[in-house]
Amino acid sequence: MLEIKNLTGGYVHVPVLKDVSFSVESGQLVGLIGLNGAGKSTTINEIIGLLTPYSGEIKIDGLTLREDATSYRKKIGYIPETPSLYEELTLREHIETVAMAYGIEQSIAFERVEPLLKMFRLDQKLDWFPVHFSKGMKQKVMIICAFVVDPSLFIVDEPFLGLDPLAISDLIQLLEVEKKKGKSILMSTHVLDSAEKMCDSFVILHKGQVRTKGNLQQLREAFGMPDASLNDIYLALTREEEL
């Protein structure tokens, strides 16, 4: 479970988030939605520990980064928007490196990812280097590496970029399975049609603050738009930005 309470933070001398509070329950997929510059990436960077909050608290399963940084980080499986691979390491070596970093036995790591390697059709490419991978293949490697960890919280940032329709379908299926296992999932995306179908709840960020949160019906009530889709609500945010 992810709990964020009264989070204010951002970059040095540049506050971005202002008193942000929301939670992601176990077995829940929450969509983090907002215009560009709303604070989505900053929120993610605060959660994974790349930024230090000015004030407020972030807990995963009741644990803060300050209390035990190693245990806290082991609870997170992060799939970034932009794939970041080591050009000198093969796919196999990437998996081995992640396992080593998290203190996971190599045999267990490969047992965990074997179904994903087959699903993403990378099982015959374990000795390939990133230079031979397309952007979509690199994104699949990032997904596989996140699943090595077997975390309690998945943070998925714009997961559909670069993926073909089959891989998108596979990823949606994977996240659904993890939900059923009781994992918490926070997903930032602009693919609103998919988010509307996948997510149990939403957090709408606007200008660094939580504009509203809840399921689609609760968002409709907050915006006074009884029949709105998630895309309609996003467009309403755009109009608010222009005021």
Describe the residue ranges of each PLM region.
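Conserved ABC ATPase signature
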Residues: 129-136
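Conserved ABC transporter NBD signature motif
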Residues: 56-67, 71-72
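ABC ATPase "signature
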Residues: 213-214
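Catalytic Walker B motif of ABC-type/P-loop ATPase nucleotide-binding domains
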Residues: 154-158
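Conserved ABC ATPase "signature" region
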Residues: 96, 100, 107-125
